[in-house]
């Protein structure tokens, strides 16, 4: 039995690993740069999950938990209107940790939607409907905020895109993020 609940600060290490998996390791290495490792990037993301003022904050995260209290999946989401303020901690952290300035990064969302930043199910728990459960819980969060729910999907990930369409997301426009072409999908309020 899986339960969906709000994340806890103590879960930051595992949440960070799943955020990195959602981003993909090539993208994480791009952010870390050639002089730093994925472990260095994991340390940064873990510190951001532990904070309350970060886009990756545990406060913005729900987790799928097994009967044995293992984290089977995560979904990180926040009000798109808060992107710039929440992303500033990532920008500051990357500058301090890697000497890289990402202040000119494209905006992946904007005001008017609950934005799903990261969705990932641990590989040992895939194909059990957990991603759909996490999406549905996040869509409900958006309804309570009176916001449609949006996300970006990599154009090279048709399997994820099919899942999003099955849940009711529709293509809004295109975007580029982390060096990848992405589709902006949105699930409207009903």
Give the label of every model feature segment:
Residues 112-114, 142-154:
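Conserved GNAT acetyl-CoA-binding A-motif
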Residues 80-81, 150-152, 165-184:
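Conserved catalytic-core motifs of GNAT/GCN5-like acyltransferases
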Residues 78-114, 118:
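Conserved acyl-donor/pantetheine-binding loop and adjacent beta-alpha core of acyl/acetyltransferases
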Residues 26-49, 95:
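Conserved GNAT-fold acetyl-CoA-binding loop/helix
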Residues 63, 70-79, 115, 120:
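Conserved beta-strand in the GNAT
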Residues 127-140, 165-166:
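Conserved acetyl-CoA-binding loop-helix of GNAT-fold acetyltransferases
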Residues 1-10, 27-30, 190:
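Conserved N-terminal entry element of GNAT/NAT acetyltransferase domains
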Residues 48-63, 81-85, 115:
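A short helix-loop-beta-strand connector motif used in the catalytic cores of GNAT acetyltransferases and
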């Amino acid at each position: 039995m899986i339960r969906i609940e709000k994340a806890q600060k103590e879960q930051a290490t595992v949440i960070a690993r799943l955020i990195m998996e959602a981003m993909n390791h090539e993208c994480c290495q791009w952010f870390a740069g050639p002089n730093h490792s994925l472990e260095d990037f994991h340390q940064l993301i873990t510190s951001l999950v532990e904070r309350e003022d970060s886009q990756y904050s545990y406060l913005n995260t729900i987790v799928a938990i097994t009967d044995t209290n293992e984290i089977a999946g995560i979904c990180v989401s926040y009000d798109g209107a808060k992107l710039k303020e929440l992303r500033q901690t990532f920008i500051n952290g990357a500058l301090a940790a890697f000497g890289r300035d990402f202040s000119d990064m494209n905006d992946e969302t904007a005001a008017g939607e609950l934005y799903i930043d990261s969705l990932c199910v641990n590989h040992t728990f895939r194909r059990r409907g957990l991603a759909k459960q996490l999406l549905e819980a996040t869509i409900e969060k958006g309804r309570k905020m009176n916001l449609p729910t949006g996300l970006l999907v990599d154009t090279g990930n048709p399997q994820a895109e099919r899942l999003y369409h099955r849940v009711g997301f529709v293509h809004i426009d295109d975007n580029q993020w982390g060096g990848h072409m992405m589709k902006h999908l949105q699930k409207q309020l009903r």
